[in-house]
């Protein structure tokens, strides 16, 4: 087993932070560094993956993260239509209120005029409620705007919450930060609440063979900086 100088430096930093560094914890830290493991748990399904990227790849394959869907974006109902018989018009903005769109169009235009930003006419300090009225079919017809066709847009829905996202990368980032909880390899080894994803389990079972742990210690023995820690591990085993 050949341990690189950079990983040895990280191991020494790790060991110096421990009050009583154990061999297994040190070896697990080494595995994190050498195999580039950053375990995460998907709590909902109680599964631990070797990394967030691995979790997303495998869960996507099982369709457990997102689904593509379509939404219809409408422009809202027209202010005036073919059934309109009378309209009330704001003289300051041109906003129109139709008798068949509002339950009480006169009250509606009064409310509008009282707060209309373009209405600067005042009487006794109160906004003037001046408006225009027309029953003329030709005038009414001039205010009819054909409704726009609704827009169909493809979006992405979270399979966990149903929340919609404009883009898939945004959804995946939200999933990663909200639903994948980071763990250390030592925490993975010491827990019994969650199961390990099959390929991650196989990897750990292979890496935790006694012969490989012994090879790890032998590789560190070539560097005097690790001798005091190795002595502690040997004394503990005896």
Curated annotation (Swiss-Prot):
InterPro entries assigned to the protein according to its UniProt record, in alphabetical order: DUF2709
Pfam families: DUF2709
Organism superkingdom: Bacteria
Family per record: Belongs to the chlamydial CPn_0658/CT_538/TC_0825 family.
Protein name: Uncharacterized protein CT_538
Species for this entry: Chlamydia trachomatis serovar D (strain ATCC VR-885 / DSM 19411 / UW-3/Cx)
Upper lineage: Bacteria, Pseudomonadati, Chlamydiota, Chlamydiia, Chlamydiales
